[in-house]
Amino acid sequence: VLRVLKGFADKNLQNINRYFASGWNRDGLALRAAGDLLQYAPGPAPRHLLIVLTDASPNDSRRIPPSPEKPLGCGYEDAAGVADTAAQVRALQRMGIRVSAVFMGEDSSAGAAAQIYGKNMARIRGMDQLARAAGRLIQNEIRELGD
């Protein structure tokens, strides 16, 4: 279940603090939903930058459905979850959406973060570093616009 806390044109910030975490994080699905939102309600901006706060450890209790490559399906965790999330990042990029990530996860997930987000990532160790890291990512995107 996804809930839009604030639309692009919404000036009211009251709902923004109604976010809460609960359970699993199927990152690929969340990225796909973000792409759908930007495609069907793009707002006034001609370009979009999506900054994701992540632990780079996508997992879910629901399995990935069977496919020709995996007739029995597989668990949404580890390599399968990372591959799905990375595929969704690439799909957003093909749509023209810039995707960057602030990674706040375990050392063991750093490789997954790099696989998913590539160079468009900043690592933080605490929430007090979030604003600075997001600012650096935004500056990098602005620099690339000038190239």
Where are these regions (language model features)?
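Acidic, glycine-rich A-domain
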Residues: 1-147
